[in-house]
Amino acid sequence: LRAEGEQKKARDWVEVDSIQEAVSFLSSVSGVIFATTGSKELEALCQIPDYQKRVYARVLPTSNVLKKCEKLGITGSHLIAMQGPFSTEMNTLFLRQTKAEWLLTKDSGRAGGFQEKVEAARENGTRVVVIRRPEEDGISLEEAMEVLKKADEGNVGELKTHLILAGIGMGQP
């Protein structure tokens, strides 16, 4: 059971379905790229022409990740190893420091700091490439409330689904 959120603002970024589509798009344009997609996507980013000059990667500061980055040739000032979450201000600083013309991110939702990244890009005039979340089977908030109401009333026999509450995010401070 997943209640799908509503998109509140019109999207003003480039959307792609996969890291490969992002690489293809970013290979067709010029400019520095600030990548916040994580270490699992780094190999694909190495397909971008001049990636060692164009790509700045923000990754988790673990020894395995740092070794992987070194092996791929993403080192020195092009490697930012820090643990989030990051505020809009912090993201803005990274974009300015790297002189990024492109922000590459996943649609990670509230818990992944997606809004802070997009706001920082807007403030900085940085264009954004977003890797969409895979389509998932979900229900509306109203449908989820109805399922919960039936379960609360003891009408579990009427339910044709299992109800699991998991991964509800970090919440607002």
Task: Indicate where each model-derived feature is located.
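Short, ordered loop/turn segments at secondary-structure junctions
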Residues: L1-E6, S108, R133-E136
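Anionic-ligand binding region
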Residues: G31-V32, T36-L79
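A C-terminal functional module that forms or caps the active site or interfaces directly
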Residues: E70-N124, V129-I131
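Short glycine-rich anion-binding loops that position phosphate/pyrophosphate groups of nucleotides
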Residues: S39-E41, S108-R110, P134, M170-G171
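Short acidic-hydrophobic, aromatic-tinged amphipathic segments that line or gate anion-handling sites
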Residues: D12-Q20, S140-K150
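N-terminal phosphate-binding or glycine-rich loops at protein starts, especially the Walker A/P-loop
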Residues: T161-P173
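Short, flexible loop segments at boundaries between secondary-structure elements
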Residues: T62-V65, R127-I139
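Glycine/small-residue-rich loop that forms an oxyanion/phosphate-binding "nest" at active or ligand-binding sites
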Residues: L1-L26
